[in-house]
Amino acid sequence: MKTFLVFALLAVAATSAIAQMETRCIPGLERPWQQQPLPPQQTFPQQPLFSQQQQQQLFPQQPSFSQQQPPFWQQQPPFSQQQPILPQQPPFSQQQQLVLPQQPPFSQQQQPVLPPQQSPFPQQQQQHQQLVQQQIPVVQPSILQQLNPCKVFLQQQCSPVAMPQRLARSQMLQQSSCHVMQQQCCQQLPQIPQQSRYEAIRAIIYSIILQEQQQVQGSIQSQQQQPQQLGQCVSQPQQQSQQQLGQQPQQQQLAQGTFLQPHQIAQLEVMTSIALRILPTMCSVNVPLYRTTTSVPFGVGTGVGAY
């Protein structure tokens, strides 16, 4: 135990001695009250001189470096001038906006197109009906009765002059009967006033066309009215009554006046011109001709001129 205590004391003494030696050798480890002002504080005024020289040498060089920089900044404005490409988008958007308002006028053009196309169609029908009515001759029934022999003569194609095939609807009469019809026609035609002869001959041709139309319609209706034979037969009196009922409205329409089709108007003009060449020459009668002032639709001729 004594030896241990002795070693401990020696160790403590050694450590204290070592600590004192270190504090004496190293000035920073001294106690604050034992520290003395360091002499190197006098070197501080020399540093500003060195720093001023460095500043005088470095700062004048910096302006030269800054003078080199303006070209770099001057190069940027053109780059900034290239940026106005972005504001070019508004005019592009304006063009798009201008294109869109062009659609309403296009839709406005489409809407008015339909009414004008529908309105002229009934107007054309009305004009066609008015022109046809103007071409239908208006003659007293008594005059038509007087010229009935002329009508039969033309309808039966008794004249040697070539007539349209549509006039020859029945068998040709004998030469004697044709001669009789010719004499009767030439007796009645001079009795008609001279100013009414043209319209009278035109009315004869018009009545022939209506008779042909009536015959065609009657044949079509008779074919439609014939019942299909499916084990049932319809009596003849019933068929006759049906035909009579079907013919009555036709006769009423013909009596009131039937509108001619475009091809019938052309037929009326052609047949009238042929009749005006035959009858005056055959009967030695003067028939004054008048040119119609109204134009016929669908490319049909404008009436018969004076010969």
Swiss-Prot record:
Q: Which InterPro entries match?
A: Bifun_inhib/LTP/seed_sf, Bifunc_inhib/LTP/seed_store, Glia_glutenin
Start-end of Low complexity biased regions? 43-88
Task: Spell out the subunit comment.
Answer: Disulfide-bridge linked aggregates.
- Top-level taxon: Eukaryota
Pfam families to which the protein is assigned, alphabetical: Gliadin (PF13016)
* Family label: Belongs to the gliadin/glutenin family.
Add the further remark from the entry.
Glutenins are coded by several genes on each of the group 1 chromosomes of wheat.
Q: What is the lineage of its organism?
A: Eukaryota, Viridiplantae, Streptophyta, Embryophyta, Tracheophyta
Q: In which tissues is it expressed?
A: Expressed in endosperm, but not in husk and leaf tissues.
Q: Which PANTHER family match?
A: GLUTENIN, LOW MOLECULAR WEIGHT SUBUNIT, PROLAMIN PPROL 14P
What S-S linkages are listed for this chain?
none
Gene3D superfamilies, per the entry: Plant lipid-transfer and hydrophobic proteins
How far does the signal peptide extend, from start to end residue? 1-23
Role, per record = Glutenins are high-molecular weight seed storage proteins of wheat endosperm. Thought to be responsible for the visco-elastic property of wheat dough.
* Species this protein is from: Triticum aestivum
Record GO terms (molecular function): nutrient reservoir activity
Location of the region described as Disordered in the Swiss-Prot/TrEMBL record: 31-88, 105-126
| Protein known as | Glutenin, low molecular weight subunit 1D1
Which keywords label this protein?
Disulfide bond, Repeat, Seed storage protein, Signal, Storage protein
